[in-house]
Amino acid sequence: MSARKYFGTDGIRGRVGQGVISADFVLRLGNALGRVLTQGRSKRPLVLIGKDTRISGYMFEAALEAGLVAAGADVQLIGPMPTPAIAFLTSTLRADAGVVISASHNPHYDNGIKFFSAEGEKLDDATEAAIEAALDEPFHTVESERLGKAIRTRDAIGRYIEFCKASVARGFTLHGLKMVLDCAHGATYHIAPMLFRELGAEVVVIGAAPDGLNINAGVGSTHIDNLAAKVRECGAHLGIAFDGDGDRVLMADDQGNPVDGDDLLYVLARSWQASGRLTGTVVGTLMTNYGLEQALAALHIPFQRAKVGDRYVHQALVEGGGTLGGETSGHLLCLDRASTGDGIVSALQVLEALGRDGQSLREALASLSKVPQKTVNVRLDGGTAKAIVEAVNVQQALQQAQAAVQGRGRAFLRPSGTEPVVRVTVEADDAGLMQDTLDRLSGAVRDAA
């Protein structure tokens, strides 16, 4: 496959008003998608458009709508909704594609576009390539009688809440549980508190007053200390933090200890194994903590690593017949319940597992011992990151580092695909060994750079 011109690993993203994240480009993007979808069809395709709460979403929603309608596609405007909700609604409303306007955990001045197929899954490479090819063609407006129509959907919230509830057992309840929800002033701000209260929880809410500019600002899964402090302050049993578009979830236990995606993956894998729900291999990424790998091995649970990015975790799960995977950042995939990473659904799976096992979150994690891990970004003065990583002296230093932590951790290098940086990561069961190995390996990379 040739290199993508516009698409990254998770759609298109950047600074608003710069490069491709502009109204005129998004207008053409909508038109390109519409032309791809109308090819070979006798009836107008249907496209759903959702967004998070950042202020630029209004501009890009209008641009996408205009481009799609001009190409002859019908549009349903969903408004502010979690990214996974758009994936679900695209499938259940029999749409031909879904589009989300969001930059996930990024600040308000960034935005992006994500796409879903008719099945509610991320677009395949061939479809992305077709959209990119159409983008390089002239904007096209069909004859008046073939123009699409746009309507605003009113029942999307109720549909998605019922979908989330259906992901847990019918008798599942949260009565007696006090929780803190941090909605990152993002797309879950109205849905998550409503859902967890309907299930019986006592809910303390923070980060649920979006103004278009405060999304992810000191709140949400990228600022977990805020959640941890609130849990301690109000004596909650646990806390749950989402990111701006609701596809990530992190937690805090009753003492305010941060709980990341690796921790949650362990809770689910162990519980699902005991209940017979776990199938296939559990999938993490290159960044998944070595301690989790060891803990799963002790439980005889097969584990594999994919490249960083939830699309690669998803690909590995599908290829291996597994249903459970995720990233340290909180992208969790429960493919027997949702077609994509869903923060709310994943949180419900964890709460259901804790209830079934009769444990608090802290108790469920008592048997997991993660190892110290640290990543250093080495900025390059010249040359490409890939060339630096492949340099003979750097490869020799990497082999020495891997030998130093063999059986006790890992050492690896990741060239950035977007900036002149090599990411140096070392983890080991001893903090001193980890730091010494990291210093030596990052020093070798700096010398080569």
UniProtKB/Swiss-Prot annotation:
Q: Which UniProt keywords apply?
A: Isomerase, Magnesium, Metal-binding, Phosphoprotein
Quote the record's cofactor note.
Binds 1 Mg(2+) ion per subunit.
Catalytic center at which residues? 104
Which reaction(s) are listed as its catalytic activity? alpha-D-glucosamine 1-phosphate = D-glucosamine 6-phosphate
PTM: Activated by phosphorylation.
Task: Name the cofactor(s).
Answer: Mg(2+)
Q: Among its keywords, does the record have Metal-binding? A: yes
In short, the EC number is: 5.4.2.10
Q: Which SUPFAM superfamilies match?
A: Phosphoglucomutase, C-terminal domain, Phosphoglucomutase, first 3 domains
Q: Name one Pfam family in it.
A: PGM_PMM_I
Modification Phosphoserine, positions: 104
User: Which molecular function terms from Gene Ontology are attached?
Assistant: magnesium ion binding; phosphoglucosamine mutase activity; phosphomannomutase activity
**Where is it found, in Gene Ontology cellular component terms?**
cytosol
Supply the PANTHER family for this chain. PHOSPHOGLUCOMUTASE (ALPHA-D-GLUCOSE-1,6-BISPHOSPHATE-DEPENDENT), PHOSPHOHEXOSE MUTASE
Family membership noted in the UniProt record: Belongs to the phosphohexose mutase family.
Protein name listed in UniProt: Phosphoglucosamine mutase
